[in-house]
Amino acid sequence: MNTVIADFTERAGTGRVLKAEPEAIQLAPEQTALIVVDMQNAYTSIGGYLDLAGFDVSKTKPVVENIQKAVTAAHAAGIQVIYFKNGWDNQYVEAGGAGSPNFHKSNALKTMRKQPELQGKLLAKGGWDFELIDELQPKSQDIVIEKPRYSGFFNTALDSMLRARGIRNLVFVGIATNVCVESTLRDGFFLEYFGVALDDACYQAGPVEMHRASMYNIKTFFGWVSDTQSFVNTFQHNQQLAKTA
């Protein structure tokens, strides 16, 4: 299998080969971030936004477990872990008014308009829906970024935080594959970041075909697709080498 090696990774001399599609890719831990997308109660829990909006969240447990494995491997290898939290102030000023397409397309906002008793509860900062799930709580060395739209690059400090740390590779896990994961990976591609999605550590909003379509888009046009075990194996190996050096 061919392996993609960016010139900056080759210069670093610390790259490890990650098995991926359509070809393997070499990643240096110090140039890589694990992006944990929106693992909030809103997107994983019964009674959260996605569930109340009519999306199936009953199969998210294996995804949560795979993300935990990826986070553990990232921490051990010295890979920067970044958590996203999607949402707005509790008055929804940040969500945009009727002049914003977000007002008309956000399923959270539409659900609250249909069910006024939910107003102020869905994706509102300070509320249960907005908070990260208990199984995925950040460590002191992790970064948490709140974002007001699907892409983590929009109206956040993500780009400057990455560039200041010399990070050029982004490995994505989280929810939803076809919305915030793909949106951020695409924007990263346009900003010259190398994006990898871990297939079995992402979950879609909607039918599983949406997940498959996003993975096809990513590996064909915008980046690479790997899996949790390959990521863990690659960077556990990296850690073992460091211990024996």
UniProtKB/Swiss-Prot annotation:
GO terms for biological process: nitrogen utilization; uracil catabolic process. It catalyses: (Z)-3-ureidoacrylate + H2O + H(+) = (Z)-3-aminoacrylate + NH4(+) + CO2; (Z)-3-ureidoacrylate + H2O = (Z)-3-aminoacrylate + carbamate + H(+); (Z)-2-methylureidoacrylate + H2O + H(+) = (Z)-2-methylaminoacrylate + NH4(+) + CO2. Its EC number is 3.5.1.110. It comes from the Bacteria. InterPro entries: Isochorismatase-like_dom, Isochorismatase-like_hydrls, Isochorismatase-like_sf, RutB. CDD domains: cysteine_hydrolases. The keyword Metal-binding does not apply. The active site is at residues 38, 147, 180. One of its GO terms (molecular function) is hydrolase activity, acting on carbon-nitrogen (but not peptide) bonds, in linear amides. It holds the Pfam family Isochorismatase. Keywords: Hydrolase. The keyword Glycosyltransferase does not apply. Belongs to the isochorismatase family. RutB subfamily. Hydrolyzes ureidoacrylate to form aminoacrylate and carbamate. The carbamate hydrolyzes spontaneously, thereby releasing one of the nitrogen atoms of the pyrimidine ring as ammonia and one of its carbon atoms as CO2. PANTHER family: ISOCHORISMATASE-LIKE DOMAIN-CONTAINING PROTEIN (PTHR43540:SF6), PEROXYUREIDOACRYLATE/UREIDOACRYLATE AMIDOHYDROLASE-RELATED (PTHR43540). This is Ureidoacrylate amidohydrolase RutB. The gene is rutB.
